[in-house]
């Protein structure tokens, strides 16, 4: 099987940036799970995007959560390389029908500023049923609607 050389170079460079440089481990890369890096046409600044599909939290405050470890990761990343992360939510009606409602977003700086610093057990998502998944919830009113 032959692979397109251009595609392989793009993939290699992407992994080098994400896992090598942004992963903050130059000798041995650490996977970062960053969804995208974008260049703002208005400011010429680069931003990181974290994208999740979620429905509103069932308990008060109504809002969207993020794993505490992820919140810390994005805070560390901003301190070390200076890039802001935007947290985009593909808001769905519920977990059963997954009906799309709208796109919502917030900077991770604002998420941390407004979220309730109370550990809430998050959904199962990609973890095992026997592990803990503590999250912090940011009230919905702090998320903007993406046009």
Per-segment meaning from a language model:
Residues 1-9, 13, 65-68, 94-96, ...:
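Ribonuclease/tRNase effector modules and their secretory precursors
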Residues 28, 37-41, 79:
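Short, conserved, surface-exposed binding loops centered on an aromatic residue
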Residues 31-33, 44, 48, 69, ...:
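Short connector loops at helix/strand junctions that flank enzyme active sites
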Residues 34-57:
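Conserved catalytic cores of phosphodiester-cleaving nucleases, focusing on short active-site segments
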Residues 54-76:
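Mg2+/Mn2+-dependent nuclease catalytic core
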Residues 75-110:
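Nucleic-acid nuclease catalytic cores
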Residues 97-147:
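Intrinsically disordered, low-complexity terminal regions enriched in charged/polar residues
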């Amino acid at each position: 099987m032959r692979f397109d050389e251009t595609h392989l170079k793009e993939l290699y460079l992407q992994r080098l940036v994400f896992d090598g440089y942004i992963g903050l481990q130059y000798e041995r890369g650490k996977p970062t799970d960053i969804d995208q890096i974008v260049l703002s046409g208005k400011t010429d600044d680069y931003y990181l995007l974290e994208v999740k599909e979620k429905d509103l939290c069932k308990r008060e405050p109504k809002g969207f959560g993020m794993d505490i470890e992820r919140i810390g990761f994005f805070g560390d990343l901003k301190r070390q390389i200076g890039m802001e992360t935007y947290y985009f939510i593909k808001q769905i009606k519920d977990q059963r029908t997954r009906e799309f409602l709208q796109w919502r977003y917030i900077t991770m700086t604002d998420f941390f500023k407004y979220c309730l610093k109370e550990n809430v057990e998050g959904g199962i998502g990609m973890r095992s049923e026997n592990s803990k998944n503590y999250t912090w919830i940011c009230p919905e009113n702090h998320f903007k609607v993406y046009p």
